[in-house]
C-alpha cells in the first residue's frame, strides 16, 4: 500500500465535497475546485466523512496514481479552506515591481518593462518595490505563475541578482581572478 495513498483526507467543517464517479468537486469558503481522477483509482467517503482513495491492484501505474490522487485531493481541500501563497523577492540595482491594477509590471534591466497579467483565480500583492506575493486557491496555478515570473530574470550565480522565492538560497560561484 502507498503510505500516502492509504491515509484518508479529512474534510473540515464548511467544506462541501461532491464525488461523481471519477469527478470530484470541492467547495469551500474561498471558492470551488474540481478534479478528474485517473480511471483505475476510485474515490469514496468513509463513515467520518473523510475522503478515501483506493486502487484495484498493485500494478506499478496504479501504485503511483494512488498517492498522487490522494495528494491532489488534499490540495483541493487545503486550497478552498486556506488558499496558497508564494512570496518572492527581487535583488539587483534598478530591479523593481509595481502593481498596475490586477497585473504586475517589472523593471528587470531590459529595454522595456515586463507586464504579467493575473490569470483567473490568482491575485498579486506588492509589499515593497522588491517584494511581492502570489495568492490563489489552486496550488498548481500559483506554483506555475511563480515559476514563470522567476524565469523572467533567474538568479545570477555570480552576483545573486534576479527574482527568487523568499528564503531561497542561491548557490554562489567565485568569479575568475585576474593576473
Curated annotation (Swiss-Prot):
InterPro entries: Ribosomal_uL6-like, Ribosomal_uL6-like_a/b-dom_sf, Ribosomal_uL6_a/b-dom, Ribosomal_uL6_bac-type, Ribosomal_uL6_CS. One of its GO terms (cellular component) is cytosolic large ribosomal subunit. GO terms for molecular function: rRNA binding; structural constituent of ribosome. GO terms for biological process: cytoplasmic translation. The keyword RNA-binding applies. Keywords: Ribonucleoprotein, Ribosomal protein, RNA-binding, rRNA-binding. The keyword rRNA-binding applies. It comes from the Bacteria. NCBIfam families: L6_bact. Belongs to the universal ribosomal protein uL6 family. Part of the 50S ribosomal subunit. This protein binds to the 23S rRNA, and is important in its secondary structure. It is located near the subunit interface in the base of the L7/L12 stalk, and near the tRNA binding site of the peptidyltransferase center. This is Large ribosomal subunit protein uL6. It comes from Mycobacteroides abscessus (strain ATCC 19977 / DSM 44196 / CCUG 20993 / CIP 104536 / JCM 13569 / NCTC 13031 / TMC 1543 / L948).
Amino acid at each position: 500500500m502507498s503510505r500516502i495513498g492509504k491515509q484518508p483526507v479529512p474534510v473540515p467543517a464548511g467544506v462541501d465535497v461532491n464525488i461523481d464517479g471519477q469527478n470530484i468537486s470541492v467547495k469551500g469558503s474561498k471558492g470551488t475546485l474540481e478534479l478528474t481522477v485517473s480511471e483505475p483509482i476510485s474515490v469514496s467517503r468513509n463513515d467520518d466523512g473523510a475522503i478515501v482513495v483506493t486502487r484495484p491492484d498493485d500494478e506499478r501505474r496504479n501504485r503511483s496514481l494512488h498517492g498522487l490522487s490522494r495528494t491532489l485531493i488534499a490540495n483541493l481541500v487545503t486550497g478552498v479552506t486556506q488558499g496558497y501563497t508564494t512570496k518572492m523577492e527581487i535583488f539587483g540595482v534598478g530591479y523593481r515591481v509595481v502593481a498596475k491594477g490586477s497585473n504586475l509590471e517589472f523593471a528587470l534591466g531590459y529595454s522595456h518593462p515586463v507586464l504579467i497579467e493575473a490569470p483567473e483565480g490568482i491575485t498579486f500583492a506588492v509589499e515593497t518595490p522588491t517584494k511581492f506575493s502570489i495568492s490563489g486557491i489552486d496550488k498548481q496555478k500559483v506554483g506555475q505563475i511563480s515559476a514563470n515570473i522567476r524565469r523572467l530574470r533567474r538568479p545570477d550565480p555570480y552576483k545573486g541578482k534576479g527574482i527568487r522565492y523568499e528564503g531561497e538560497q542561491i548557490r554562489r560561484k567565485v568569479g575568475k581572478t585576474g593576473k
